[in-house]
Design a protein with these regions (language model features):
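Conformational gate/switch positions in structured elements
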Residues: 65, 102-103, 158, 219
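Glycine-rich nucleotide phosphate-binding loop and flanking beta-alpha elements
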Residues: 67-68, 104-106, 161-162, 186
Length: 259
């Protein structure tokens, strides 16, 4: 396993480091690493679940898979991995955190995102390409995609049905925390486009602060034209642009303080 202890001071202004967390049972970590490293100005590194610090990284990715065999519930054991304290602490101070598929489940179990992911309504494992519609275009993960943009992304899960009680659902909609919904090829949200029975066709949500995003589809598997879609790369690029803008703001503030 590859661990990371390089100093953040060694990074250039134009290079960003993403941490890809590896739990026992993760199987999309390589996909995430390849997708991120394929983008200019980005470098991803694996971080083993027993590590305790993510200070060297600009963003965190929790990949798909079957962390700890999905025993008890999907993500229920991974939530107690040593690295998760750092994930939670960094999320609370504004660092970008992305959870795909099993990573989304871990984020819900950790309390970083509301709701829960339960068994698909069909009681079957679903593996197919789906269409998602961007509902929010001012989040750090989708600001490069105008509202209504359609993203073709693959799904592969058995427990991807998003559920939330009525109060939580109202809050999600009121605060514009629903980032993606399953839709048909015309962009219409219909039951037939929903692969797992998720309430209100919800495919991905963010926290109220908008720096934590979880989705069941795999942007990492849609970041190479040879795989049939490059739409997933838009999510990673949006993260890069957000971090770059934040750096520019911080630099400007430092200049003002010196002046």
């Amino acid at each position: 396993m590859i661990t990371t202890r390089n100093s953040a001071r060694q990074r250039t202004e134009f290079t960003m480091k993403f941490a890809v967390i590896q739990f026992p049972g993760s199987n999309c970590d390589q996909d995430c690493l390849a997708a991120i490293n394929g983008l200019d100005g980005l470098r991803a590194e694996y971080v083993w679940h027993k590590e305790t610090s993510l200070d060297d990284f600009d963003a965190i990715v929790l990949p798909g898979g079957f962390a700890y065999g999905d025993y008890l519930r999907c993500g229920a054991i991974a939530r107690f991995s040593p690295i998760m304290k750092a994930v939670i602490d960094d999320a609370r101070v504004g660092k970008l955190v992305l959870g795909t598929c099993n990573g989304f489940q871990v984020l819900c179990e950790a309390g970083l995102l509301p709701g829960a992911l339960v068994r698909n309504r069909s009681l079957r494992f679903v593996c197919e390409m789906v269409t998602t519609r961007v509902e929010v275009d001012d989040s750090p993960f989708t600001h490069g995609c105008p509202k209504g943009t359609l993203l073709r992304l693959p799904v592969a899960h058995g427990e991807g049905c998003f559920f939330a009680d009525e109060a939580t659902l109202r809050e999600l909609n009121f605060n514009h925390q629903v980032i993606l919904r399953y839709a048909d090829n015309r962009g219409v949200v219909v039951p037939e486009a929903n692969p797992n029975g998720s309430i209100e066709n919800i495919a991905g949500i963010c926290n109220r602060e908008r720096n934590v995003f979880g989705l069941m589809p795999h942007p990492d598997r849609a970041s190479d034209a040879r795989l049939g879609s490059m739409d997933g790369a838009k999510i990673f690029r949006s993260m890069v642009e957000t971090i770059r803008a934040n750096r520019a703001t911080e630099k400007s503030e430092r200049v003002k303080q010196v002046a």
